[in-house]
Amino acid sequence: MLKNDLFLRALRREPCERTPIWVMRQAGRYLPEYREVRSKADFVTLCKTPELAAEVTVQPIDIIGLDAAIIFSDILVIPEAMGMGLEIIESKGPRLYEPIRSAADIDRLVVPDVADKLGYVADAIRLTKKQLDDRVPLIGFAGAAWTLFTYAVEGGGSKNYRFAKELIYNHPDQAHKLLGKISQVITDFLLLQIEVGVNAVQIFDSWASALSEDDYKTFALPYIKQSVEAVKSKHPDIPVIVFAKDANTILTDLADTGCDALGLSWNIDIARARQELNDRVALQGNLDPTVLYASPERIREEAGKILAKFGQHTEKSGHVFNLGHGILPDVNPEHLKALVDFIKEESGKYHQA
């Protein structure tokens, strides 16, 4: 029995005493304790060593006092499990070797047994659950098919997604074949994480804004919907969050996937998003991550604006406070603590019946 289930209740749009808070990338370089662990292992080794992954997952719960933990991993463990070599290059980001550029390349990618190839994530979840001891929920996650497709085809990050766009425009059938393969592994991976104990899952579509609205509805949205439906059909009580970064014009379409909550980027007004969606789903977000460089007083002021814009809760509303993207690595941890304390102290007034 969870001692603090506010996060799950907010996602289910059930009554809460206050607004829960967690932040994306909360297990990360802004924490000196994380940097100490990281000094012992490179990033990929950290992901693949369950004891270390569990340790850094729990750190922000112990140190900052957030309302949910998110398992320490990376969205690119999926293409690696499918047969692509993965390296995280310091200060340059991820690199996937032998990028997918042809039909033969697509064929050589395997749909693995995730319990085998990604068993180290399952082991990290089991260890983390023991260390959390039911203090807060644990979130599992995966990248969305479109975002993983871009990494697989480009071989890393990209400014214009030239090769990914070339594939969807010139060879749409091949693109859909690759997206379908990736989507199957995403679904299997989310289900594995649920089976070993996570309490909710989030799908990250980091490169959602790279596509036009029409292309997003063709090459991205159907695959998100596929994963959401698969999870909800097997585990109807497990909340699913979809975070499609900067996809501000298609919130209704994203809600139509059947997810329980939508993560919002910081460049959309949360009041407008709530009005547009009419409390059909819970909302998560959406403070600009750079606000955490400001003084604690200013952080509280900006966070207060978001609470006020979301407004008074009703019997069918849900809000999880978060950043509009991941916390930046050089933020002062005390500034995040100031934000968390403010939300805990001040959000209750918006939950009074």
Curated annotation (Swiss-Prot):
Substrate binds at R25, Q26, A27, G28, R29, D74, Y151, S206, H325. It catalyses: uroporphyrinogen III + 4 H(+) = coproporphyrinogen III + 4 CO2. Gene3D superfamilies: 3.20.20.210. One of its GO terms (biological process) is protoporphyrinogen IX biosynthetic process. GO terms for cellular component: cytosol. The record marks D74 as: Transition state stabilizer. One of its GO terms (molecular function) is uroporphyrinogen decarboxylase activity. Pathway: Porphyrin-containing compound metabolism; protoporphyrin-IX biosynthesis; coproporphyrinogen-III from 5-aminolevulinate: step 4/4. Homodimer. This is Uroporphyrinogen decarboxylase. It comes from Chloroherpeton thalassium (strain ATCC 35110 / GB-78).
